[in-house]
Design a protein with these regions (language model features):
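Acceptor/aglycone-binding surface of glycosyltransferases and processive sugar-polymer synthases
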Residues: 68-70, 74-82, 99-178, 205-223, ...
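The conserved acidic donor/metal-binding loop of glycosyltransferases
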Residues: 92-97
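Cell-envelope/extracellular polymer assembly enzymes that use nucleotide-activated donors
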Residues: 7-9, 41, 183
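Catalytic donor-sugar/metal-binding loop of nucleotide-sugar-dependent glycosyltransferases
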Residues: 151-152, 173-176, 186-203
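A conserved acidic beta->alpha catalytic loop
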Residues: 46-54
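Short aromatic/hydrophobic "clamp" motif used to bind/position activated sugar donors
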Residues: 88
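Donor nucleotide-sugar binding loop of glycosyltransferases
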Residues: 17-20, 49, 72, 98
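Short, well-formed alpha-helical segments that are part of the catalytic scaffolds
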Residues: 17-33
Length: 233
């Protein structure tokens, strides 16, 4: 009897990313993941794009689901609900994250028997990949994470993580916007006591225009969100 392959789903929220979406999808190393015994599925969540993002994603071989109500966190939740049971990986649609490294991340995930793996972009920034404002904000949020939750996490804002879908039922995820990335790490690694690890990655300069128009405002909203969670959770 042929052993059934495990499933790994790469969930990619996308809003008007026609310049980068094909490059992002093609970076997923499906052949290498097949050799590791996984059926690799790319799931693009189109978050109300007004350009050709969804059509290009389908042509590039991705499954596409539509989430017309905009919000980074909302798009991710839609992707999680649509993904099959197994392992989920997240990444942005702007070609910043090293999707070619998924096999090595998966090996670390399996070898360490993890429930949740997150990544540290600050360990390998390409020139121009992150503004000084964003770097400062990330460091402030990392300090807040250590103080409030005793989690030694260098980059709590990273958008590339890997986790078992079956942990989602225990997580209280309230944000439908940018703070979801930080919130899911706190929920998994602190409140749910998942086995977790943070590993360094290379982070590239994005293709196309950023959707993050006011980094300080977004960072403040994130900080308030996690502080409130610490007080009322």
């Amino acid at each position: 009897m042929t052993e059934q392959k495990k499933v790994i789903t790469i969930v990619i929220p996308a809003l008007n990313e026609e310049r980068a979406i094909v490059k992002t999808i093609h970076a997923v190393p499906k052949a290498a993941l097949t050799e590791m015994g996984y059926d690799a599925q790319v799931l693009v969540v189109d978050n109300g794009s007004t350009d050709g993002t969804a059509e290009l994603a389908r042509e590039a071989g991705a499954n596409v689901v539509l989430e017309p109500n905009r919000g980074y966190g909302r798009a991710l939740k839609t992707g999680f609900a649509s993904a099959q049971d197994g392992v989920i990986v997240t990444a942005d649609a702007d070609a910043t994250y090293p999707l070619e490294d998924i096999p090595s991340l998966l090996a670390a995930f399996e070898d360490n028997n993890l429930d949740f793996l997150t990544t540290n972009r600050l360990a390998g920034l390409d020139d121009g990949a992150m503004t000084p404002v964003n770097m400062t904000g990330n460091r402030i949020l990392a300090i807040a994470t250590r103080v409030l939750f005793q989690l030694d996490m260098r980059d709590p804002e990273s958008g590339m993580w890997m986790f078992k879908k079956n942990i989602l039922g225990a997580l209280e995820l309230h944000s439908n916007s940018w703070p979801l990335s930080h919130e899911i790490k706190i929920e998994a690694c602190y409140y749910s006591q998942c086995r977790w690890k943070e590993v360094p990655i290379r982070y590239r300069r994005r293709v196309g225009e950023t959707k993050l128009l006011n980094a300080w405002k977004v960072g403040l909203i994130d900080l308030c969100h996690i502080a409130k969670k610490r007080l009322v959770r």
